[in-house]
């Protein structure tokens, strides 16, 4: 999710030789006050706009950068947030909020050691601040955990959780009245019962969950990194974007558009989990349908099907709360086998993030990506999961701090080289649930309405018909869900108001 295109101004303007006049300073303060009001109203795009105007008038005020950094954090523009926080500290090394903001930005980017250094600075300056101490201690735990994971990775990196499971010996207790696989297989009856069971806020038995995970891993590992699908003229397929643990909105998609079947195929374009607090329900439902219709129900990996994101934004915590740490490890293994892209009739390419940091990438290059891993910090795999379009030509540094932003000329050149018509991607919330950019060559679809219970956005899904492949957009709005807030299982730092 991110702010609208074209709103960004540079983070670090060069200081002026002469200080601004008193009237200019007064106007800058008025703009900051307006920005603060927009921020309180959760209108972060306008908050950023007015903070930026204040900075233009007075580029030496650390508070303006600190405030805009927080607004960027709320819109998931972590790269911009990091730049603003760093600039605030450069302007005023005693501005403690600058260190808080920079730590939050680095946490969001998975740069835990860098975050720890800033939390340490805050604790030294404010040794009696309980909030600062708690954040420092929590971040320190993560750094130590990561160090431990690296230490044991050499011995166990390729050892599968599956090897240590004995599913057959797991007993389903007599008092459990929920859905069970029939002879170890997913059926349509099981799936209907499962969705109702989840709708009633009940938990699937761990044996059934493990059965689904082990079986879906077997299915996914046989797929190509680039899935290629042919639609006949009379056939259609539905493409959905981010669902982010919003299970009741997922049910609404199936209510509006029909359950998956061999005649009603789906593609879900990544970011199934995190943020929403029903991520386990979402992902096991999607995996169940993948087992039921392996050739007609498609799942692509998003940037949130990764360990770093799951550790921060809730999925790891949710699986541990509802099941066990071992089950989360198996989820992580399964996520590594999710394909990265899908091509329809050789003309429409679908991926979660977008296009590439370098020219000349071909479909064959995508096919050759070894996806069974955590994504690197750069390169084609990273770009497919993380990049975003921009309105201006060329490429620029990513607002997220990962991968890049690519312009209409980049999209046009990629499509021409690969004989494609357009791309479909997700990865960003859009007010109307979708966006058509780059002269119709870059389509964004987002399927989590009222994202995180606060954005107020519509959501959408796309129909593609084999006869012409023109995208047909279908919008929908959020439905009620049980009183469990988003991020309920997120990292403690997030719950403490890190962002």
Curated annotation (Swiss-Prot):
GO cellular component: cytosol; neuronal cell body; nucleus; perikaryon; plasma membrane; protein folding chaperone complex; protein-containing complex; proximal dendrite
Annotated binding of Mg(2+) 1, by residue: 242, 244, 271
CDD domains: MPP_PP5_C (cd07417)
UniProt keyword list: Acetylation, Cell membrane, Cytoplasm, Hydrolase, Magnesium, Manganese, Membrane, Metal-binding, Nucleus, Protein phosphatase, Repeat, TPR repeat
GO molecular function per UniProt: ADP binding; ATP binding; G-protein alpha-subunit binding; heat shock protein binding; Hsp70 protein binding; Hsp90 protein binding; identical protein binding; metal ion binding
Expression tissues: Predominantly found in brain and, in lower levels, in testis, but was nearly undetectable in spleen, lung, skeletal muscle, kidney and liver.
Description of activity control: Autoinhibited. In the autoinhibited state, the TPR domain interacts with the catalytic region and prevents substrate access to the catalytic pocket. Allosterically activated by various polyunsaturated fatty acids, free long-chain fatty-acids and long-chain fatty acyl-CoA esters, arachidonic acid being the most effective activator. HSP90A and probably RAC1, GNA12 and GNA13 can also release the autoinhibition by the TPR repeat. Activation by RAC1, GNA12 and GNA13 is synergistic with the one produced by fatty acids binding. Inhibited by okadaic acid.
Binding site for Mg(2+) 2: 271, 303, 352, 427
Modification N-acetylalanine, positions: 2
Active site: 304 (proton donor/acceptor)
Swiss-Prot/TrEMBL cofactor(s): Mg(2+); Mn(2+)
Cofactor: binding comment: Binds 2 magnesium or manganese ions per subunit.
Effect of residue 56 to A: No effect on phosphatase activity
Name of protein: Serine/threonine-protein phosphatase 5
Gene name of this polypeptide: Ppp5c
């Amino acid at each position: 999710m991110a702010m609208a295109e074209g709103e960004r101004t540079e983070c670090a303007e060069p200081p002026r030789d002469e200080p601004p006049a008193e009237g200019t300073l007064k106007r800058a303060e008025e703009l900051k006050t307006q920005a603060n009001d927009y921020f309180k109203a959760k209108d972060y795009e306008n908050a950023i706009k007015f903070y930026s105007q204040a900075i233009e008038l007075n580029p030496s005020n650390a508070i303006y950068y600190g405030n805009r950094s927080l607004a960027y954090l709320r819109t998931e523009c972590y790269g911009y947030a990091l730049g603003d926080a760093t600039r605030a500290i450069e302007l005023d090394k005693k501005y403690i909020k600058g260190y808080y903001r920079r730590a939050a930005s680095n946490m969001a980017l998975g740069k835990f050691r860098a975050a720890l250094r800033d939390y340490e600075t805050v604790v030294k300056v404010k040794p009696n601040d309980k909030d600062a101490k708690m954040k420092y201690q929590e971040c320190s735990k993560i750094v130590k955990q990561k160090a431990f994971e690296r230490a044991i990775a050499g011995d166990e990196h390729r050892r599968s959780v599956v090897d240590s499971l004995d599913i057959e010996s797991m007993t389903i207790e007599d008092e459990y009245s929920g859905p069970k696989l029939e002879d170890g297989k997913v059926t349509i009856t099981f799936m209907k019962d499962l969705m109702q069971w989840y709708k009633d806020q009940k938990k699937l038995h761990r044996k059934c969950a493990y059965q689904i995970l082990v079986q879906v891993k077997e299915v996914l590992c046989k797929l190509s990194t680039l899935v290629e699908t042919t639609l006949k003229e009379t056939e259609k397929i539905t493409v959905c974007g981010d669902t982010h643990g919003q299970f009741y909105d997922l049910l609404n998609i199936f209510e509006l558009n029909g359950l998956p079947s061999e005649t009603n195929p789906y593609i879900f374009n990544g970011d199934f989990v995190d943020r929403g607090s029903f991520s386990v329900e979402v992902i096991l439902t999607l995996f169940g349908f993948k087992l039921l219709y392996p050739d007609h129900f498609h799942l692509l990996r998003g940037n949130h099907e990764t360990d770093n994101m799951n550790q921060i934004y809730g999925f790891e915590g949710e699986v541990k709360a509802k099941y066990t740490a071992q089950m989360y490890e198996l989820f992580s293994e399964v996520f590594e086998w999710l394909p990265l892209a899908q091509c329809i009739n050789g003309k429409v390419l679908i991926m979660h993030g977008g296009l590439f940091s370098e020219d000349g990438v071909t479909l064959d290059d995508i096919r050759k990506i070894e996806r069974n891993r955590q994504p690197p910090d750069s390169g084609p795999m990273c770009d497919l999961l993380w990049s975003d379009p921009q309105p201006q030509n060329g490429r620029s540094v990513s607002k997220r701090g990962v991968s890049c932003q690519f312009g209409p000329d980049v999209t046009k050149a990629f499509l021409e080289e690969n004989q494609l018509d357009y791309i479909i991607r997700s990865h960003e919330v859009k007010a109307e649930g979708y966006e058509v950019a780059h002269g119709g060559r870059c389509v964004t679809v987002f399927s989590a309405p009222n994202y995180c219970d606060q954005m107020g956005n519509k959501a959408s899904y796309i129909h593609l018909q084999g006869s012409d492949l023109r995208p047909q957009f279908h919008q929908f709005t959020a439905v009620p869900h049980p009183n469990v807030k988003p991020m309920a299982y997120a990292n403690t730092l997030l719950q403490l108001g890190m962002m």
